[in-house]
Design a protein with these regions (language model features):
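Non-catalytic, solvent-exposed segments at the cell envelope interface
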Residues: 1-291
Length: 291
């Protein structure tokens, strides 16, 4: 990280016009998943959305894409002011968050599901946990955090692969102060967990898929998706089952600049570069695959 630029005022931000955003590419279906930073989410009094991800099912190219969004970036708020993206849903609602992602990144995503951390924990438990390979530093952090001895199988010790229960997986996805890559690390860990779960369901049957869907619908805080929308999304997911998940961080590191704004550590973003990179990822003219 470079020293924070002490700018009196961030650069102006010019979002795109929502109503003239292009239609999704043929076969691509986007859904926004957001997780608030408390265990029990209250739809009428939301916390900060610390985890925001766009899931894309590309049924034409048989691709499964996870695009995560950095929590510290500055965006134009619905009132025209500038603020961190993590406060948009709390202050303006989840529709406003989906709209903000759409207009800043140039991809219209209007269907969303919002979770609390307890929802994510229950869903991962319902799916039988998730195998995760951790570094020594991550293992130390999880032990210092005092996750229960039975939170992973075997009990967390040092670097290696463990089966994580839901609670431990949520703590893992929230790690920020390990490895020196801050929020980028947190974004990467979110993509790792989702990608691993997807790969566990490579050969999913309809019965299993419906069980996964009911674990989601039983454990969400807020959504604008009808049951019909959910079943449609499940159909798309089954069409791309078996695809190797691809992940992208938005904005990319090189399109962000640290800036202290309103006494907060934030990131000023080159949205034009970000939109071009995201478009290229969706166009598949080049593919960025997480390690």
């Amino acid at each position: 990280y470079s020293p924070h630029a002490l700018a009196a005022k961030p650069r102006d931000i010019f979002p795109l016009d929502y109503d003239t955003l292009p239609a999704a590419l043929p076969g691509q279906h986007h859904y926004l998943l957001a997780c608030v930073d408390n265990w029990a989410a209250n739809p009428n009094n939301l916390g900060n959305t610390d985890g925001v991800m766009m899931v894309t099912f590309d049924t034409r190219a048989k691709r499964l894409l996870f695009t995560t969004f950095m929590r510290e970036m500055l965006v134009q708020r619905p009132d025209g002011g500038i603020g961190r993206i993590t406060y948009i849903a709390k202050n303006n609602g989840v529709e406003a968050l989906a709209r903000t992602i759409s207009t800043h990144f140039g991809v219209k995503v209007d269907k969303y599901i919002l979770f609390g951390m307890d929802n994510v924990q229950k869903i991962i438990d319902a799916l039988g946990g998730v195998p995760i390979t951790v570094t020594n530093e991550e293992a130390d952090y999880l032990n210092r955090y005092r996750i229960a001895r039975n939170a992973t199988t075997p009990s967390m010790d040092k670097a290696g692969t463990y089966l994580f229960g839901g609670h431990a997986a949520v703590i893992y996805m929230r790690i920020r102060k390990v490895g020196g890559d801050g929020d980028a690390g947190r974004n990467r860990r979110m993509r790792t967990v989702l990608s691993t779960l997807a790969q566990q369901y490579r050969d999913v049957t309809l019965t299993q898929a419906l069980a996964v869907l009911s674990s989601v619908t039983d454990n969400l805080c807020n959504t604008n998706m009808s049951m019909n929308d959910m079943l449609q999304a499940l159909g798309y997911a089954m069409q791309v089952a078996g695809a190797t998940p691809e992940g992208l961080q938005m904005p990319p590191d090189e399109a962000m600049e640290p800036i202290t704004y309103a006494d907060m550590s934030t990131r000023q973003v080159d949205f034009e570069k970000s939109r071009n990179d995201l478009q290229a990822f969706l166009d598949n003219s080049f593919v960025v695959v997480d390690d």
